[in-house]
Amino acid sequence: MRNEYIDHLIVFDLETTGCNPVQDYIIEIGAIKIKDGEIVSKYHQMVNPGIPIPYFITEITGITDDMVSDAPYISEALPSFLDFCDTDYILGHNISFDYRFIKSKCSSLGYTFNKKALDTLTIARKFLKHLPSRSLGPLCEYYGIDLRNAHRAIHDAEATYRLFQCLKKDFMDVDASAFIAKEITWDPPKQEMITSRQKKYLADLIRMHRLVVNEDIETLTKSEASRMIDKILVQVRSGQK
């Protein structure tokens, strides 16, 4: 049994500031494009989250604030990634995590992202139950896949595809249904975006008090904008900037 889309897909991985796709931020996107089983192009983009990167995230990924300070915000970076994803099929390791982040950011910025997905984690859990861990690192070690720079998006994406090839070789003939891409049914909770009145008020506050704001105001939700306004007012009243 052969599924054509197995050899025509986008493999991608994200690094983020946390695990909540609505409240946390993307800081790195790495993707590779597969056609006829070969890597034909790559996509890599650092993303400015607009907030300090948590210390534990820097410890895990090696990504620092300096590395993203001049990077585009997600509102600027997302369109080029969506253009790169020119197929209906995606692949990742624990793909639902990455999918939900992209889906959430697309929703807040007015884009759509509806794909069918293959997940090497799901496949490994089905066929490699004897392994103590089915995380990407241990699976790569099991198959002898070189995973340099783990927890960096582009390297994880490349390793994920090599892992997929190994799993397909070993288990495609055992149960081909495990290699059929499936819909991910998840929609982000609806959030109202920043209002035009809030945008103007924030802009006036920032200009009047000569503040430096390291966030992309255009992508704020209504509640996030309210929190930022309250924070600025508290700082101004206390004499801080």
Residue map of PLM features:
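Short, glycine/acidic-enriched loop or turn micro-motifs at the edges of active sites
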Residues: 16-18, 122, 159
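Generic alpha-helical structural context detector
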Residues: 122-125, 141, 162-165
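Acidic two-metal-ion nuclease catalytic site recognized across multiple nuclease folds
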Residues: 165-241
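Conserved beta-strand -> loop -> alpha-helix junction used to position metal-binding or nucleic-acid-contacting
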Residues: 112-124
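Conserved non-catalytic scaffold segment of RNase H-like nuclease domains
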Residues: 1-115, 129-151
